[in-house]
Amino acid sequence: MLEYKSFFFLLAVQLISISASSQETYKGPSQCGDMEVWDYSTGMCSPRAMSEMPMSMVMLHGNAFFVQTYEERPRGRDAFSIPNMLMFDVGKSVKNHYFNVDVMATVEKWTYPKDGYPELLQIGEKNEDDEPYIDAQHPHSSPIMGLTLSDTISLGDDRDYLKIFFAPRGQSTDGPVAFMHRVTGMVNPDAPLGHHIGQDVGHITSTVLGVSWAVGRATIEASAFNGTEPHPTAVDLPLGPLNSYAGRFIYRTSDRSYLMGSAAYVKEPEPDEPTLDHIWRYSASFYNEHVINEGWRFYNTFIYGLVNFYDNTGALNSFSEEFLFTSNWHNIWGRIEYLQRTSSELDILSATPFEPHWVTALTVGYTYNLLKWKDGKFGLGASLTKDFLPTDFRDSYGGDPLSGKIFLQLEGMKMWNFSSARSEMPKMNEHSH
C-alpha cells in the first residue's frame, strides 16, 4: 500500500508544479541575454557568438559540502565527507563560432571515506579493493570528471545554433540534466538514488563525440561514445572505441519550463561482467521555476529513468521529484524518490537475488545562507531522510531506517569577459547554477 501512496504523492506534487509554471511570473531559459543561449547539459546560460562582437570568456564555478552523516543501524554508519565539484570554462568567438573548453573537476577520491559517502540504499561502482559500494555513493572520477572541447555555431540572428563537441571524458546525450548542475540538486549533498537507473549515469562518460542542434523551441542531440564506465577511483583519462550511441530531444514548453527525453544503447558497460553485452537506458524529465513573490522562488525537477538488463533484471525503474523554495537567505528543499532495487545490488542474502522491489526515500532539508557576497555564498544546512522498505529488505535494515546530515556549503561563481563589446555583454544568468 505504501508503494502506491508514494507514487501518487509524487504525481500530485508534480501536477501542482506544472500548474504553477503556467503563470507569467515564471522564469527560465529566457533569462539568457542577447549574446547567450541556454545550455541544457549544464543548466546555465552559455555565450553565443556574434560576428560583429568578438569576445573571450572565462568562468569558474565551485560547490563543496562539508558533511557529517548519521544513519540508523544495522546498515547505517556515521562519517565525515566532502562532496565537491569545480567547473572551469574558457572560450573565444571567431565570427559565428564560439570555441570552448570546459573542465569538470573534483577531489572526491581524497575527500570520501574508503567505503564511499554514506547513503542508505545507494549502489554503483567498486572501490580500490574491487568491493562494490553498497549503501554509499561512490566518489566521482578524480581529478577530472569531464574535459569537453566544443564549437557552437550561431545560425542566423535568432538563438538557433549547431554545437559539435568532443570529450575524452564528458557527458553523453542521455539522461536528464546531471544532479550537480540542477538548481534543485545543487543544494543537496546527496546524489539521487536513481543515479545508476537511467538518471545521471551518463554525465561521466569516456570518449564522447556529439552534436546538438537547437532550432526554435526544440533541441535535438546525438552522440557516440565508449560504453565502459570509467572507474571512479582511478586517476586516468582513457580513450576507447565509439561503440555506444545516445539521442536526446528537448522541447521548451514555455520561456520558463522545458521537457527532456533520451534513449541510449550502451555496449559493455561493466568490464567486470563479461556476459553483459549491452544495456538500454531511457529517461524523461521536466524542469520549471515559479516566482512566488519578489523574495521567493520555487524550482522543480521531475525525472523518470529506466535501465534494461541491469543486474540480471529485465528492467529497473526510478522516479524522482526534487524541489527548492529559495529566498535571499533561506533555502527549503527536498527529494522524493520511488525506485526499484534488487537484493543482489544491496547484498541482502535472505531475498530472491534479482527480483525488483520498490523502495521509497523521502528527504527534506534546510540551508541558511550565513554569508553572501557578489560571487558566492556560505551556508549552514541539515537534512533528514526516511526510507520505506519492502518486507524482504526490512530485516536487513532493521525496519525503515532514518538518516540525518549536518553540513556547511561553500558555493561560488565568477565570470570574466574580455570582449571589446564588454559594456554590451550581459552577465551570466545568476539562476543558471
Describe the role of every protein-language-model region.
Residues 60, 64-68, 101-107, 164-168, ...:
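Transmembrane beta-barrel strands of outer-membrane/channel proteins
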Residues 95-100, 157-162, 217-221, 255-261, ...:
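Repeated loop/turn-to-beta-strand initiation elements of outer-membrane beta-barrel proteins
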